[in-house]
């Protein structure tokens, strides 16, 4: 039987920024974690637009994106309420939705459980397990902010997709890695995706 470092759920929605979720899952699998992956229909549409994917074979896309690493990625259909992550008895260490659309955010805040993604988030709340939401929207209206505040009061971590620049990023990957690294920090997973403030930076000075 394979022993994993931990088990987490990752949700990817239709907010722009699919690369955040992809990079996160790749890093978790590389480090030996088991990842339950749920992608909304709008999330798949964003995959096609942002990754220039031409095929409709979703399994092939998942297999190609997450081929490397010692962990495991289990993909679940959005309407599969029989998935283990839909139950509080399953030992799911935590969940992150990256990026998170405002529609999904609203559904979670209202306890809608309208699909597997929302149901799993609801399980995290009722079991008082770690739930991290990475919103990717701008500007924000009052409803968005109130939903974030409501979830924050329940113990949810709201981690906006806002990259830092003190590490002097040179590429788009550097910006993506900063946000993904922050997300991994919240999940308690060690990484080397960016240089932390105060650490030596390649011959740069402030």
UniProtKB/Swiss-Prot annotation:
Alphabetic keyword roster: Flavoprotein, FMN, Prenyltransferase, Transferase
EC number: 2.5.1.129
Keyword Cell division listed: no
Lineage top rank: taxon: Bacteria
Sites where the protein binds FMN: 14-16, 40, 101-104, 136
InterPro entries in alphabetical order: Flavin_trans-like (IPR036551), Flavoprotein (IPR003382), UbiX-like (IPR004507)
Catalytic function, reaction form: dimethylallyl phosphate + FMNH2 = prenylated FMNH2 + phosphate
A molecular function (GO) term: carboxy-lyase activity
Enzyme class at the top of the EC tree: transferase
Binding site for dimethylallyl phosphate: 166, 182
Pfam families on file: Flavoprotein
Function of the protein: Flavin prenyltransferase that catalyzes the synthesis of the prenylated FMN cofactor (prenyl-FMN) for 4-hydroxy-3-polyprenylbenzoic acid decarboxylase UbiD. The prenyltransferase is metal-independent and links a dimethylallyl moiety from dimethylallyl monophosphate (DMAP) to the flavin N5 and C6 atoms of FMN.
NCBIfam families: PRK06029.1 (NF004685), ubiX_pad (TIGR00421)
Similarity comment: family membership: Belongs to the UbiX/PAD1 family.
Name assigned to this protein: Flavin prenyltransferase UbiX
Gene source species: Halalkalibacterium halodurans (strain ATCC BAA-125 / DSM 18197 / FERM 7344 / JCM 9153 / C-125) (Bacillus halodurans)
Gene that this polypeptide is encoded by: ubiX
């Amino acid at each position: 039987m394979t022993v994993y470092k931990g088990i987490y759920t990752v949700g990817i929605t239709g907010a722009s920024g699919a690369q955040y979720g992809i990079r996160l899952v790749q890093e978790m699998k590389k480090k030996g974690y088991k990842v339950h992956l749920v992608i909304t229909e709008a999330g798949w549409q964003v995959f096609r637009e942002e990754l220039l994917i031409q095929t409709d074979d979703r399994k092939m896309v998942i297999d190609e994106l997450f081929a490397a690493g010692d962990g495991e990625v289990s993909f679940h259909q959005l309407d599969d309420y029989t998935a283990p992550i839909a139950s509080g008895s399953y030992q799911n260490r935590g969940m992150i939705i990256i990026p998170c659309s405002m529609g999904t955010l609203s559904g979670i805040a209202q306890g809608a459980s309208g699909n597997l993604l929302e149901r799993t988030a609801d399980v995290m709340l009722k079991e008082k397990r770690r739930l991290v939401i990475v919103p990717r929207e701008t500007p924000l209206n009052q409803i968005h902010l109130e939903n974030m505040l409501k979830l924050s009061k329940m113990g949810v971590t709201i981690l906006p997709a806002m990259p830092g620049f003190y590490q002097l990023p040179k590429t788009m990957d550097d910006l993506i890695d900063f946000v993904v690294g922050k997300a991994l920090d919240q999940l308690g997973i060690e990484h080397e995706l960016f240089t932390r403030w105060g650490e030596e930076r390649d011959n740069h000075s402030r």
